[in-house]
Amino acid sequence: SIRSPRVRQTFKKIGYPENVSKVLGALCCLHRHLPQGAPTSPALSNIVGYEMDRKLAALAAEYGLTYTRYADDLTFSGDVFPKEQIIPQVKRIIRDEKFEPNHKKTHFMNQSSRKIITGVSVASGVKLTIPKSKKREIRKNVYFILTKGLAEHQRRIGSHDPAYLKRLIGMLCYWRAIEPDNTYASDSIAALKRLEKGY
């Protein structure tokens, strides 16, 4: 996570005076951290992590690998991954840039492994899909809403979220973005949007 002093420092680096940087840092942070889900957080975390990304991308290129990052998920991919040589260097770069590697989230996958990266399943090397467990969860919620009604479904699962339907439509839009040919996702979006108009 990125703490407010680093955010404040980022604003100073790009030219804001100390007092303005302090106010902007306070506005962009919640409980002294960049909050997940805020529209400002991705851009600020990318600015803060720029130097780390540059160093890790250069390291990956040395070994013929590709480096990508989404939020705090770092991915190195390639045909051969020399663990013993590259991992210590990755950890050093991360720590040099004042971040801490999360060992619990470190995974190594080979060609036959089930690969889920940033919530997307990578099948057959190139095909992107939503994990089956996520599809089952979405299908179940859509089914109960369309057969029992939104209010009854929310009562049954104990949800008081006024934006529940919008969130479910958002999940389906995400599914459709990953799998554009998936007719279930498109049909469900249309059905839930019709239902939404009645609320």
Regions found by a protein language model. Give the residues of each.
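Right-hand nucleic-acid polymerase module
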Residues: 2-14, 18, 25-31, 35-38, ...
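Catalytic palm active-site di-aspartate
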Residues: 37, 41, 62-79, 119
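Short, surface-exposed recognition loops or helix-turn segments adjacent to catalytic cores
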Residues: 21-29, 62-74, 105
